């Protein structure tokens, strides 16, 4: 047979706990304030260009929209357009920057594959690539060491004249 125990009721426990503790009151505005540090990036709005008026030289670029309050970024919000080849250059420069700065723990994933098919300008293929680039850039920009220490990342995301 189990020995009998006396239990405090929930209200008694809650009353005794709350009466001895001072709680910080949060207002509705405080709860929904901007986070202390944030970086939001989205790859969106693909646009296919016909520079010579025909299929030769066609390319698609993507808008990169950024909102941040991180001190390493010069603008709180920005919008730039980038081609796939710009992403390739960015990845190459980022790897070089990491090698020179002794950050061996940071590995940069491969970009989504290059599209070599004749239907590379179809809406479905462009959307698939956009999603892949969005996921890839989010993983790169989401790394804390890159957010705070990569000048190449900042230039790629915010400088409209990014050339490497």
Curated annotation (Swiss-Prot):
It is a peripheral membrane protein. The PX domain binds phosphatidylinositol 3-phosphate which is necessary for peripheral membrane localization. This is Sorting nexin-3. InterPro entries: PX_dom, PX_dom_sf, Sorting_Nexin. The gene is SNX3. It is found in: Cytoplasm; Golgi apparatus membrane; Prevacuolar compartment membrane. A 1,2-diacyl-sn-glycero-3-phospho-(1D-myo-inositol-3-phosphate) binds at residues 83, 85, 114, 120, 129. Required for retention of late Golgi membrane proteins. Component of the retrieval machinery that functions by direct interaction with the cytosolic tails of certain TGN membrane proteins during the sorting/budding process at the prevacuolar compartment. Binds phosphatidylinositol 3-phosphate (PtdIns(P3)). PANTHER family: RE52028P. PROSITE patterns: PX (PS50195). Keywords: Cytoplasm, Golgi apparatus, Lipid-binding, Membrane, Protein transport, Transport. GO terms for molecular function: phosphatidylinositol-3-phosphate binding. It comes from the Eukaryota. One of its GO terms (biological process) is late endosome to Golgi transport. One of its GO terms (cellular component) is early endosome membrane. Disulfide bonds: none annotated. It holds the Pfam family PX. Belongs to the sorting nexin family. Residues 40-163 form the PX domain.
